[in-house]
Amino acid sequence: MIPLSIRVPASTANVGPGFDSVGIALSLYLHVVVKEKSNKWQVIHSFDESIPTDDKNLIVSTACKVSPSLSPYIIEVTSNIPLTRGLGSSASAIVAGIELANQLGNLNLTTDQKVQIATNFEGHPDNVAASILGGTVIGALDGKNVSVVRIESKELGVISLIPNEELNTDESRSVLPDVFPFHEAVKASAISNVLVAALCQKKWEVVGEMMERDHFHEPYRLELVPLLPSIRKCAKEFGAYGTALSGAGPSIFILTPYEKRQEIAEQLARVFTSMKVCELEIDHTGITVNKEERIEL
């Protein structure tokens, strides 16, 4: 019998101009199952050999930072979230680690505390808040203070186009400018403001328009994801609301009318054969914990 299992959804961040602020939880998942107590941490997984199987694993190292006195366990980790593709794989691991510490250490963390801790680890709230809360989130980090608002977007469908190539977040951030001209910042901020207002009022056509008018990061990352303009053009012709980079890339994130998501995904798959086209849904639940028997502490 499984004593404890944790499920964390993937996420997409930015949604165009909502840079490091807007996130959406997606229906791809990281699962952590606690097996038994051990004399040292062991992580069972079938990922690449570069992913640690001891206390250096991101899930375990996060848990131990949150609760340094945590006893070691054997855990099993499975996931269908692609690594280093802009779908929040590291954020999901951080969120899983915080919940692992919360459960095994009996910390009784509130949701707000989990979001605060996760944001401190990740450096921005968009991915982690989406994975914790589910749905669409808008967040801000000001010094050490995190503010997050969650909204529902059940009328939306999601398509992700995932390339075979990885793109490290640090590499993707390295192409961004160190200094942003004031007039460009004003323009970019205004577009982001309209995006958020449109999300709240469910004006999906406006959401799609604003998604495609980012000034903060996409113009600088186009050299790393050259297919974005052609994917954006085709998606719009097929009936999508809007297309943007998923997080730092290289995956592409498309919002569609919910009832058209399958049709649009099939059309895109016929055109962009070198990419994996995934018809997804917005996860509205966020992190879930399943306890089937008491854990020996």
UniProtKB/Swiss-Prot annotation:
Protein keywords: Amino-acid biosynthesis, ATP-binding, Cytoplasm, Kinase, Nucleotide-binding, Threonine biosynthesis, Transferase
Name the UniProt record assigns to this protein: Homoserine kinase
Listed EC numbers: 2.7.1.39
Source organism superkingdom: Bacteria
EC class: transferase
Key word Acyltransferase present: no
GO cellular component terms, A-Z: cytoplasm
Function: Catalyzes the ATP-dependent phosphorylation of L-homoserine to L-homoserine phosphate.
Localization per record: Cytoplasm
